[in-house]
Regions:
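Non-catalytic, beta-strand-enriched accessory regions in extracellular/secretory proteins
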Residues: 352-385, 397, 428-432, 443, ...
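Beta-strand-rich structural segments
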Residues: 385-392, 513-530, 569
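Primarily auto-inhibitory N-terminal propeptides
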Residues: 17-150
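Short flexible loop/turn segments that cap and initiate beta-strands
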Residues: 403, 526-553
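C-terminal edge strands of extracellular/lumenal beta-sandwich accessory domains
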Residues: 303-347, 375, 398-401, 406-415, ...
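Active-site-proximal segment of zinc-dependent metalloprotease catalytic domains
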Residues: 115-119, 133-134, 138-270, 275
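Beta-strand-rich domain onsets/edges
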Residues: 380, 488-520, 526
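Glycine-centered loop-to-beta-strand initiation motif
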Residues: 428-432, 440, 555-573
Length: 610
């Protein structure tokens, strides 16, 4: 850590200690909390999801509060606050990245990391009024949080603000990528109503200053162990105390406060730091990760840790009570086989430039500690390249990936890998060369691993793998006598179909916002064998109609499919509040050496809204 960064952190910690806690109705702080709990200690411990000895340890944290009316703990994370303007140099991270952030800034409030997941984390940047919750009281019946704002114009969102929102969402989504949860910036359901998060989610409201109502400098505040219980919604994150909305600070604070909602407490150390800053390139999410490239959940495996709670076990504990249902989050299902025998086969495509070379690609997630994802492919003998891409750094250069991989390449039936790739002091990414000794079946294993500063415990997250290798020879066919004329090779096909869609209903900004409509659709390109095709170029247009909105076609837009063969379309007409419909039309589809099979595709898609 640079000396200037150390100075900033020292100033923050000292300022927090001297500031004193604000006077919030029904809340007592730190050293006064134990006395206020009194004989209710067993109930308070149960509400916090801990035993009594652990509760007594938690009460030594000067940022802990006790809500006497609800017998609940809350954290006011004053030591997460950062002086305005104290923007650090970008944390070091890999320059090699996976798919870039969405460049369509209209998507900023329609983002989803895992649509349809049974749990949701809502990142609310557009302003929020909190009423009827544990945060409210007779003297504070409503808490009005302004929108996320950099330029002093809260009624509209600038391009810079939208880019920051997308960057923050992407980082928080990576922090929770191992779980079956949708991290989303879409705050309303299809009818335009606020999402009901009872028994399924939590909201983080990101905007304004802690001095707007809390009354002291804090990076965020949240009730403990209250995921899925809307009476304790939301968690508050205060950009004004986070480098004036600096994305790295905001996403670290957001994941930290949501961690409290999931039952997690602070990761500090035994040498006087309530919030650990980690070591080397790593820091715990429940400490302070502002100046480290890699932040992860923890179980106290770092030096001098004062908190040994198992973050992943707490988050996935099926007995945790929400409102009436139990189980905060589950791990997301394993997406690829975890052994050589269960390896997912890759169907490669010879390159147009050199048919003697074949490419193949896949995307994966390391969901559990020590998880391994296995892929298989048939190749000829010769040089091969295996490339890894992780969640990319933010546009301002701050790393966001959580997973470190050890990559192994195996030959079929071998007792040891042909090659192992595992960088020290940095996350594995980029191209890795290996020589395949003979034609045959080979395997790639991507394994979550640790590094000098952290273990494999929470080395979890998304990645993509791309391979280039010698094209395997086809088995020779017997030649009858006389030999018939050779048959033409079967045509390769692209079949483009609708994978999923939703009608997106939202609200505009300003004093009298109108209802807005849009279509969010995911399409997938596959070959005749059902294998996803990456790099397919698709041009599409959209036609809109409603009772008060004249029929109109949008300009044609070109999309390119990802490594999973998919791309997302988001289209919306001008603001309208009447019933209507949208028709998306595929105009062209191309990817060498394939031919578009229009009859087996879905070239025209019509969607309606009430």
């Amino acid at each position: 850590m640079a000396a200037s960064h150390v100075a900033v952190m020292v100033l923050v910690l000292v300022a927090a200690c001297l500031a004193g806690k604000p006077d919030i109705p029904n809340v007592v702080w730190h050293e006064n909390a134990a006395a206020a709990i009194g004989t209710d200690i067993a109930e308070v411990a149960r509400n916090a999801g801990v035993d009594v000895p652990e509760l007594l340890r938690l009460l030594t944290d000067r940022d802990i509060g006790y809500d006497t009316a609800n017998k609940r703990l809350l954290y006011a994370c004053e030591s997460m606050a950062v002086p305005a303007g104290a923007t650090p140099a970008a944390a070091p991270g890999s320059a090699t990245a996976g798919a870039a952030d969405p460049t369509d800034l209209t998507l900023a409030f329609k983002l989803h990391s895992r649509p349809g997941a049974p749990r949701r984390l809502v990142l609310d940047f557009t302003g929020h009024t909190t009423t009827g919750t544990a945060w409210n009281s007779a003297s504070r019946p409503s808490i009005v949080t302004p929108p996320y704002d950099l330029d002093g114009v809260p009624s509209t969102f600038s391009d810079a603000e939208r880019r920051n929102i997308i960057a923050i969402w992407r980082a928080v989504a990576e922090d929770f990528a191992a779980f079956d949860v949708d991290v989303t910036t879409e705050e309303t359901d299809a009818s335009g109503a606020q999402l009901n998060l009872a028994d399924n989610g939590a909201r983080a409201v990101i905007g304004g200053s802690s001095y707007d109502w809390y009354g002291a400098g804090a990076g965020g505040v949240a009730y403990v162990n209250t995921f899925g219980n809307t009476y304790y919604d939301p968690a508050f994150v205060f950009p004004a105390q986070l480098g004036s909305g600096y994305p790295k600070y905001v996403w670290e604070a957001t994941s930290h406060e949501l961690g409290h909602r999931l039952g997690l407490s602070h990761d500090g150390d035994t040498v006087g730091n309530a919030y650990s800053t980690g070591s080397g390139i790593w820091a715990p999410i429940m400490g302070v990760g502002y100046y480290k490239a890699v932040t992860q959940f923890s179980k106290g495996e770092y030096a001098n840790a004062n908190n040994k709670e198992d973050d992943l076990a707490i988050i996935t504990d099926p007995t945790r009570l929400m409102t009436s249902a139990r189980g905060f989050m589950a791990y997301r299902p394993d997406d690829l086989g975890s052994t050589m025998a269960a390896a997912a086969p890759l169907a490669g495509n010879p390159t147009a430039a050199d048919p003697a070379r074949t490419t193949a690609a896949a995307v994966g997630v390391i969901e559990r500690s020590g998880d391994a994802d296995w892929l298989s492919f048939a190749a000829g003998a010769g040089p091969a390249t295996v490339s890894i891409a992780l969640t990319p750094a933010s546009p301002d250069g701050n790393a966001r990936a959580n997973v470190d991989l050890r990559l192994e390449v195996w030959a079929s039936g071998a007792a040891a890998p042909l090659a192992t790739f595992n960088t020290a002091g940095a996350l594995l990414s980029g191209a890795n060369a290996v020589t395949l000794p003979a034609a045959g079946t080979y395997y790639v294993a991507a394994i979550g691993t640790g590094d000098t500063d952290f273990t494999s415990y929470a080395s979890l997250g998304e990645y993509s793998v791309a391979l280039e290798y010698p094209t395997p020879s086809s088995p020779p066919s017997p030649s009858p006598s006389p030999s018939p004329s050779p048959s033409p090779a079967p045509a390769r096909e692209i079949r483009l179909t609708l994978s999923s869609y939703s009608i997106v209903t939202g609200r505009g900004t300003g004093k009298n916002p109108a209802t807005t409509y849009g279509v969010s659709a995911i399409l997938i390109a596959k070959d005749e064998n059902g294998t996803p095709i990456t790099g397919t170029s698709v041009t599409m247009g959209a036609t809109w109609a409603s009772s008060t909105y004249s029929k109109s076609s949008t300009k044609t837009v070109t999309y390119t499919t990802s490594a999973a063969g998919t791309f997302q379309v988001f289209a919306s007409p001008t603001t309208t509040v009447t019933p209507g419909s949208a028709t998306l039309t595929i105009n062209t589809v191309s990817a060498s050496p394939f031919t578009w099979n229009q009859a087996a595709s879905t070239p025209v898609m019509t969607f309606s809204w009430p």
